[in-house]
Every structure is written in C-alpha cells, then in structure tokens.
Amino acid sequence: MFFFNKNKEKSNNSKLKILSGYNYRYKDIGKESEKTIIKYADYFNFDYEIDKRSSFERHFYWLKIKMFIENLEKGTHEFYLWLDADTFICRYENILNHVDKKKHIFVHNQFFKSKHKTKISNIDYLTWGPNVGVILVRNTKWSLEFFRNVWNKKKYLNHYWPDNAAFMDELGYKA
C-alpha cells in the first residue's frame, strides 16, 4: 500500500483553478506532471488542487467528474481546468486568452481507432471524439448539471473507458 502526502492546494485567485489527481498506479508519472502543473499555476497565479487519495468510490478515472461537481458547487472560480496525471505543460500561454469565455466546456478532441474494419489490411478507420483528459469548464449552472448527468450514468461503471464513455453519451455520441 502506498501512502501519499496530503492534497496539494493553492488558493488566492478566483479566475481559474487547475484540477488534477492520481493514485498509486500513476504515482511516477503523476509526480512529474504535478511539477509542471504547479509551475504553470504559479506562473499565471492560478489556483490548483491535486488529489492523491489512495482509494475512491468508483474507478479512479471518475475522480475528475467528482472534482468538477464539487468545485462547481462551491463556485469559487470562474473556470476549472482538469489535467490528467500524464499531462505535461510545455508552452506557458494563458489558456484563458485562447478560448471563447462564453462557452461552457472545452474538451480535447482526438482521433480514435474505429471498431469498424476496412477491406485493406493495416488500414483502419478513425473516429473523431472527445478525450476528457484535458477539459476546461466555465462555472455555470449548465456545466454543473452536465457533470451531474455524467456522474449519474452508472451504466458505464464497468466500461473500459468509464468516464469518457459517460461524457460522450451525455454529448450524444455512442460510446
């Protein structure tokens, strides 16, 4: 059993709070990612919260959904940015200068290998879809309700990609 230090948290800016977390399975990469998150947060004077609990009520991937709900309910910041434990920040640009601040959610999109097969060997179909490893959320009632709905999609608790599948379902995609 691994034991971690208490959650790391900084509080003095109400514009943006960076959220992240990892458990013992992601400890090595999480520690490295944490360094870049703190450096980025300090550079722009953003708040951050890095949760390192050793157990969670669901698969640990769901932690981001729970942290969004808890932080949106508190309402202390205008935006919340989730960064997975394998995220590294290389460019020190203020993310809030690159988004339309009227929108509710910004999510990283990427190509996924489709389950559908082509007739040509070694050629795969690709599907475009969201990846919830990096999400920027504006603090609105709509955002809070959205993440509550994602949390309540219990049919994805045993899915191989549980949090992302529930998120995609809430957007109307097939997971």
PLM feature spans:
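N-terminal anchoring/stem segment of glycosyltransferases
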Residues: F2-F79, K141
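Residues that flank catalytic or metal-binding motifs in active/ligand-binding sites
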Residues: S14, K64, L83, P130-G133, ...
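Short coil/turn segments at secondary-structure boundaries
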Residues: K31-E32, N94-I95, R148-N149
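A structural signal for short, well-ordered beta-strand segments and their strand-loop junctions
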Residues: E49-I50, L81-W82, F106-V107, L136
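Catalytic core and acceptor-binding pocket of nucleotide-sugar-dependent glycosyltransferases
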Residues: H59-W62, K66, V137-A175
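The conserved acidic donor/metal-binding loop of glycosyltransferases
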Residues: D84-F88
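Conserved donor-nucleotide/metal-binding helix-loop-beta segment in metal-dependent transferases, i.e.
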Residues: I89-W128
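A recurrent flexible, glycine/aromatic-enriched loop bordering the glycosyltransferase active site
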Residues: N122-V137, Y156-H159
